Amino acid sequence: MTTNYIFVTGGVVSSLGKGIAAASLAAILEARGLNVSMMKLDPYINVDPGTMSPIQHGEVFVTEDGAETDLDLGHYERFIRTKMSRRNNFTTGRIYSDVLRKERRGDYLGATVQVIPHITNAIKERILEGGEGHDVVLVEIGGTVGDIESLPFLEAIRQLAVDVGREHTMFMHLTLVPYMAAAGEVKTKPTQHSVKELLSIGIQPDVLICRSDRAIPANERAKIALFCNVPEKAVISLKDVDSIYKIPGLLKSQGLDEFICKRFNLACPAADLSEWEQVIFEEANPAGEVTIGMVGKYVELPDAYKSVIEALKHGGLKNRVSVNIKLIDSQNVETKGTEILKDLDAILVPGGFGYRGIEGKIATARYARENNIPYLGICLGMQVALMEFARNVAGMEDANSTEFMPDCKYPVVALITEWRDEEGNVEMRSEDSDLGGTMRLGGQQCNLVDGTLARQLYGAPSIVERHRHRYEVNNMLLKPIEAAGLRVSGRSADHSLVEIIELPNHPWFVASQFHPEFTSTPRDGHPLFSGFVKAAAEYQKRQVK
């Protein structure tokens, strides 16, 4: 089977939505019965985004096999059924690291190592490796055409089109077509110049996705086609929409999938978008609204919690309610008190690292527990719930995590010192170990306890969820906490690690060490988020009474 590649680039400005557009196209092709995958190539020099600031880069999306990747891979998994892996995302830093390691080993036999051919060859090898076994692979190139950082990637895909054959490759370019209010018309010149930039490095786009705040008139599309040397039917108008889940239908209505299938000579049935139509209907017709407060450390950039925000919306879809998400800085809880948590139907505390704002999160968990407000804790959100309960219910006044207070009297959360790496080898780590790539990562089995809320929500005795953390519940101090009323409702397969906890005497209080948001999708939702939003709606009804 020959894999077909669609290379997706962006021009004029950044943040055009290449990832969403590419994922939407992938969803249509998948709906035609094709085996589709996606890749993201990031031009930054970091080896991966694992140690990058969430406020700068946004969230780190964790794949099933434990790769720390760009948040666009989250979009990919929410739009198509194919699960991403470490093969689906790589950076300039990763490529250079691999090439330099080979150079030190002598793999290049004394040759002068250069961007061309060594770096470009390494990029091509990874693209081909990631594309194995699929009918179509969409490869998104990060950054904007014209950026110096992107040049090796653009050169690599230019070469790959020759290597694989133009009959199996396609270049799709996203551009901005701005509307000038003073002139009362859209302007195509930025698109023309962006295509000219692509042509200067040897790439002729086959499809142009033209982003605008309105539909682009037919005469302007014809003008773009003429000056950019593409068929008029391959100039796609992609206007702003109120829901990203409308984009697959918008692209399909303009025949983009049909154009691609003919280009690749793929015989497949018409796309069935009924699942997406159902998602759009549920989103547009809520029976109510709930307000959920998310108390975090990186709230100035909502993309730092992208998957959590999307998972809450998915929970709303499954309960036919609109979810109003109120982002609250945990430091404000410390300075202003829990008054700012009033008028919420539920509270979620997501993951995070470092001491800043931690006492605000602990106060938030206490407020939810004492006021019977539905609470969902994720990763650090579970740890603060445990610390709060230990301090205020189990009588461990100094309870803390060794991440924040190494010498505390009751280290109820502590560093795991014995780990297994990707190959299964035992490795010892400490607080001084490298930060990058040294966490418990990826899908891990969790066995749920019968009779618990977690078991009821999942409807299965065993689950697999994704992790990203270094610290775990300290089993040595767990007995008095359980005796005080906290219940461990799920443990790792070897029973050594606490994965999920709950409070049986609370209407809905669940916290997990894993990240359930990474496996939530608009079509399927996720048991924890669906149950959490349902609990928020029930809490709201009780308050009205």
Swiss-Prot record:
Allosterically activated by GTP, when glutamine is the substrate; GTP has no effect on the reaction when ammonia is the substrate. The allosteric effector GTP functions by stabilizing the protein conformation that binds the tetrahedral intermediate(s) formed during glutamine hydrolysis. Inhibited by the product CTP, via allosteric rather than competitive inhibition. Pathway: Pyrimidine metabolism; CTP biosynthesis via de novo pathway; CTP from UDP: step 2/2. L-glutamine binds at G352, L380, G381, M382, Q383, E403, R470. Its EC number is 6.3.4.2. Keywords: ATP-binding, Glutamine amidotransferase, Ligase, Magnesium, Metal-binding, Nucleotide-binding, Pyrimidine biosynthesis. Pfam families: CTP_synth_N (PF06418), GATase (PF00117). This is CTP synthase. GO terms for cellular component: cytosol. It comes from Edwardsiella ictaluri (strain 93-146). GO terms for biological process: 'de novo' CTP biosynthetic process; pyrimidine nucleobase biosynthetic process.
